[in-house]
Design a protein with these regions (language model features):
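Active-site-lining helix/loop region of Rossmann-like oxidoreductase modules
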Residues: 133-199
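Short beta->alpha connector loops
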Residues: 57-60, 117-119, 141-142
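Conserved dinucleotide-binding and phosphotransfer motif residues
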Residues: 21, 48, 155
Length: 199
């Protein structure tokens, strides 16, 4: 089983789901708990992990990740570079590329973009209208992509590889659309984007 570090925003949902299927999860935080199962420093959590999940507000990414030893680490990037304009969610991308590409450049990690295009509660799997929840995955590393795809299968989710890491730009746009439809327009958090193919 993978030892996993999940950070901040989606940590409870994804961490709980991974724990439920047998993985050992530790959480990184600025102010660690006295109990390791509740939270470690970011550095200690990364040192423990075979897989790191980054689920931070994008504005905190550089501050948190830059000091960490992540070169070559397997890392899931679940961040979205989000801003708001008069109550409407807008993409606030880095100067070049996507959040996923920036995290890869910053850390030297083997980044898989994923778990960022639906509500956190869907990390635990399940179906909507009889269809599994799709997880859009972008990565330049085939082995890392395979590991994360297998995790999706374990969680009862359907991995949908969408291509190289630069495709993270598209999934981050999709996340903004999800926020607009599900939250701003009030369609509800059960809304997901599903790939439907004719047999």
């Amino acid at each position: 089983r993978q030892r996993v570090h999940a950070a901040h925003l989606r940590r409870v949902a994804l961490g709980a789901a991974l724990s439920k299927v047998g993985h050992t999860v530790r959480y990184g935080m600025r102010t660690p708990s006295k109990r390791p199962e509740d939270g470690l420093t970011f550095a200690d959590a990364v040192g423990f992990a075979e897989l790191v999940v980054v689920a931070l507000p994008y504005g905190a990414v550089e501050e948190v990740l830059a000091p960490l030893e992540l070169e070559g680490a397997l890392l899931i990037d679940a961040t979205n570079p989000l801003g708001w304009n008069e109550g409407v969610p807008v993409l606030a991308p880095p100067k070049e590329g996507s959040a996923g590409e920036q995290i890869a450049a910053l850390t030297g990690a083997r980044v898989v973009k994923g778990f960022n295009t639906f509500g956190a509660e869907h990390c635990a799997g399940g179906t909507i209208e009889g269809r599994p929840i799709d997880v859009h995955l972008a990565s330049d590393d085939g082995e890392a992509l395979e590991v994360v795809s297998d995790l999706c299968d374990e969680l009862g989710l359907r991995p949908i590889p969408v291509g190289p890491l630069y495709r993270a730009r598209a999934t981050e746009q999709l996340a903004i659309l999800w926020i607009q439809l599900a939250i701003v327009e009030g369609r509800g958090r059960k809304l997901v984007f599903s790939l439907v193919e004719e047999n």
